[in-house]
Amino acid sequence: MTLMFTSRTAVYCSNLTTQRSAVTILRTLSGTASNGIKSRSALTAYQQNPSLRTRNFHSTSVVQAKDFFPEPDTPHIKKTKTAWPHPIYTVEQMNQVAVAHRDTRNWSDKVALIAVKLLRWGLDTVSGYKHGKAQALHAQDPQEAQKRYGMTGKQYLVRNVFLESVAGVPGMVAGMLRHLHSMRRMKRDHGWIETLLEESYNERMHLLIFLKLYEPGWFMRLAVLGAQGVFFNAMFLSYLISPRTCHRFVGYLEEEAVVTYTRELADLEAGKLPEWETLAAPDIAVDYYNLPEGHRTMKDLLLHVRADEAKHREVNHTLGNLDQNSDPNPYASKYDNPNVPHPRKDIKYLKPSGWEREEVM
């Protein structure tokens, strides 16, 4: 008797639940038909909130648009501040950045310059960049030169992503080795570590900015993996042997980076990159450089990146002029007379060939 009563109760409850579910569905459909605006708001919230898209029981995957590096799902954290705020560059200062070269003065400089030329040749070969031939043909037939050797916006972005993916290696290697050297010898480093790590961080920010404009494929990822591994180990061994040569090498390398971004700006201003003329700087660039309203174009972004590379050029040429073991870092030092030009983090007193030791010590 008890068993029969229990069975009937279960069946009744099941039917009642089914009826209530059906009524709920009908009410929902009716509400959807009469409240279109509310439905669209709910749909928007559904799309923007990943937690609402979680399905406990499913047999098919959810198709979602991919972001290259999406924001982390941390509702209680509004924003993570940068450890190294970027200095403010004026438009006049950035326009004064120019292509420059420091002449070699000893065997160490010559070794560094030869290494940079070989590296530049390899990068030009891989990316199909032939500026020398383009200039020679441009004097005879500009249209044919642009057709055969002209770079598109996408090709420049590919080159920039690859360049910036390895550009952050030298500063990290040098900062790491000096950090270990300071602990091992139980002596101060006199401010070199911070500047070197900040330089590496700045190069990584360049990479993150360009990744918002171009997403590399598997081939470039493999190329970056190999190049980064080889470059890291080469810099590691070289810095142990001659830190001065490594800083001169990076100084010459940054000279080439200034050349690259100067040519990109020239092509953009000449109308050869129409896809960049209306391209806005990514939000990550706006936040990092504090770009004001009306100065958030691709040209403004390239001006800032080129100015950064010009600053790295100066910093490494300056560090290459100093005593690697005893001299303090002039970019982390406080001078007694602030009115006299001296090394700074910004580009107010930019020196393409670096500051000589006698000028800063």
Curated annotation (Swiss-Prot):
Bias kind Basic and acidic residues: ranges: 343-361
GO aspect biological process, one term: alternative respiration
Keywords per UniProt: Electron transport, Iron, Membrane, Metal-binding, Mitochondrion, Mitochondrion inner membrane, Oxidoreductase, Respiratory chain, Transit peptide, Transmembrane, Transmembrane helix, Transport
Keyword Transit peptide: yes
GO molecular function, a single term: alternative oxidase activity
Job of this protein: Catalyzes cyanide-resistant oxygen consumption. May increase respiration when the cytochrome respiratory pathway is restricted, or in response to low temperatures.
Protein name in the entry: Alternative oxidase, mitochondrial
Gene: AOX1
